[in-house]
Amino acid sequence: MKPIEFSIAGIGAWGAGFENWPQLQQLLSGEQFEAHTLKGPKPEIIPANERRRAPLPVRLAVEASWQATQASGYDAKDLSCVFVSGLGDTQLTDYMCKVLAGENKALSPTKFHNSVHNAAAGYWTISTGCMQAANSVAGFDNSVSLTLLEALIQADAEQRPMLITFYDAPSSQVLKELLKNEQSFAVSLVVVPSSLSKSKANLSISVDSEPGTWSQANWCVDLNNCYQTNPVARVLSLLALFAQGSGSSNSISMPLSEATSLTIQQLKS
């Protein structure tokens, strides 16, 4: 495919040791990790009654999305969006399996409502009044690369900015042996095609017909662990590349499938 050039206009972030992009950027540059005592973010864009019922994955996604749109200068109502969770809401999956396996099979209507994979996209579009296209993706370990490809192809084809949100919460206790993630993580990007960018595009993506491998983590121990066990935390490799600025021509590769990979190139200014 022809390379797609783009810029990142805004970034939002929330995780176990950071509450925004500047704090995450400091961790990527070598500062030490300090774990949160908070249970999770409380995104003000969600009305209070709905926020109390919103599960952790939804609150992670909406908080990061709101930060990114505010930083970008774009109105949330004008942005098509793609949300991705590699694991889904394992707490609700665990709950529903236990209830349905028991004698009383009456599920909580609220929990059932929140169990769908596009719950975060629904909370976001309703809270912001967004009527643009909203999609929800799942790709387990390859969630980041698949979502970047889908969202950036859409942004390029429609020539419009896009919101991309990556989020995963800790795995439920019963699933931790299989899904070892123990950290909350959410990052949101507002990406802009090169033709619409107010400044020169600083990144490009292309698909290669050969296998790829994830970049080696080289940050603090806790961030490295998150990168290894939380599927959507693999976006940290893109953020680390972006944080280098446009003075270099470095690149990273991400697996798409057994035979293909996504290459992200840092463009020189």
Label for each model-derived stretch:
Residues 1-117, 121-133, 166-269:
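Conserved "HGTGT" condensation-loop signature of ketosynthase/thiolase-family condensing enzymes
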